[in-house]
């Protein structure tokens, strides 16, 4: 299935691989000649006949149709290890979904005894400046807050000043990238602080270009979620700090949680930038059924349309994995139709 979803499906949906720097999703004769010589990733689309092994695959492929903008999806059943992906190996803008990795990098320092959850640091508040006027956007120090609160608001409220506060403490983007590499996750890169990322947003259209700065693949983000959830990367206490913050997320109510049944718990982190919306998280159902999902949507005409696409894909992923695992939905009884009368 992964071979089809990672290759055949990409072509079947009309998607094209991109090179490392921001480039249009097109090729010309010069690029084709260069590609032939040096084996780069930019290639003319090949023709494939879409073959689906299951109706689950077909449904996700239909929902992730990229005709109006690239859509990347990756998900894994955390109980069985079964995976599904569409453009799962292609880079998408991280936006604020990177904040989970920033929190994890800080919590490692807590476990090493260098800091604690009560250590206080100042918020880093952006100072108005023109786009691209400096390598890094200027910031000023704001109120001091304990690290535990910084982590909670950077995830649950997507606070940029809180994120940049901890990003500076851990050693900047390079330190977060290093933490990810040490966990075995390669297709992830933070290159700027959030203040700079937001100030300079809009340089490229993510629906037609790939900017390798501040980007990751959906598969990489699912690997991050899986490792955190299963306790592979951090201690049980640190793991719970992140999951609790994700469970309190206030942003993205129209994304992953929007179409979920009331009996599931969603722990997630959203991301939004120019012409792109994303949501990554853990969906826990009854009987311990849990999946990790990463959904990155570009284009589609408007933010509301992107959010609706995320919601429908997330529900289809949950239902598809639950059905394959034989997880029954809890029966909800009305006041006039309960067992025994």
Which residues are covered by each model-predicted region?
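Active-site SXXK
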Residues: 81, 93-123, 293
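A short, well-structured edge-of-sheet supersecondary motif
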Residues: 55-88, 283
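Structured C-terminal helix/loop/strand segments within mature extracytoplasmic catalytic/sensor domains
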Residues: 26-59, 63, 168-169, 173, ...
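Active-site-proximal loop and beta-strand segments within enzyme catalytic domains
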Residues: 108-153
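Mid-domain, small-residue-enriched loop/turn segments at the edges of structured enzyme/sensor domains
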Residues: 70, 143, 151, 164-225
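Acidic helix-start/capping segments at beta-turn-to-alpha-helix junctions
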Residues: 78-79, 117-135, 170-171, 194-198, ...
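Bacterial N-terminal signal peptides
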Residues: 10-20
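Bacterial N-terminal signal peptides that target proteins for export
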Residues: 1-11
């Amino acid at each position: 299935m992964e071979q089809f979803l990672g290759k055949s499906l990409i072509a079947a949906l009309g998607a094209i691989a991109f090179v490392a720097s921001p480039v249009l999703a097109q090729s010309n004769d010069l690029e084709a000649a260069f590609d032939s010589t040096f084996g780069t990733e930019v290639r003319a689309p090949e023709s494939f006949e879409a073959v689906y092994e299951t109706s689950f695959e077909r449904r996700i492929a239909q929902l992730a149709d990229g005709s109006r903008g690239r859509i990347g999806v990756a998900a894994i059943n955390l109980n069985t290890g079964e995976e599904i992906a569409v453009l799962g190996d292609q880079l998408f803008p991280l936006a604020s979904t990177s904040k989970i990795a920033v929190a994890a990098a800080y919590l490692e320092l807590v476990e090493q005894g260098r800091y604690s959850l009560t250590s206080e640091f100042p918020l880093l508040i952006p100072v108005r400046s023109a786009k691209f006027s400096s390598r890094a956007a200027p910031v000023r120090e704001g109120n001091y807050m304990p690290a535990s609160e910084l982590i909670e608001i950077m995830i649950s409220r997507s606070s940029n000043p809180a994120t940049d506060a901890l990003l500076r403490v851990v050693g900047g983007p390079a330190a977060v990238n290093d933490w990810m590499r040490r966990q075995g996750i390669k297709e992830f890169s933070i290159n700027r602080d959030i203040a700079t990322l937001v100030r300079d947003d809009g340089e490229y259209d993510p629906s037609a270009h790939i900017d390798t700065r501040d980007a990751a693949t959906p598969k990489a983000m699912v690997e991050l979620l899986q490792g955190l959830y299963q306790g592979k990367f951090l201690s049980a206490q640190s793991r719970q700090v992140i999951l609790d913050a994700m469970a309190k997320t206030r942003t993205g109510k129209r994304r992953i949680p929007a179409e979920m049944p009331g009996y599931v718990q969603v722990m997630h982190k959203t991301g939004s930038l120019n012409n792109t919306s994303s949501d990554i998280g853990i969906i826990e159902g009854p009987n311990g059924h849990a999946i990790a999902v990463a959904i990155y949507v570009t284009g589609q005409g408007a933010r509301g349309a992107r959010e609706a696409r995320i919601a429908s894909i997330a529900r289809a992923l949950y239902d598809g994995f639950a059905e394959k695992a034989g997880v029954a939905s809890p029966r909800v009884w009305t006041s006039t139709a309960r067992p025994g009368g």
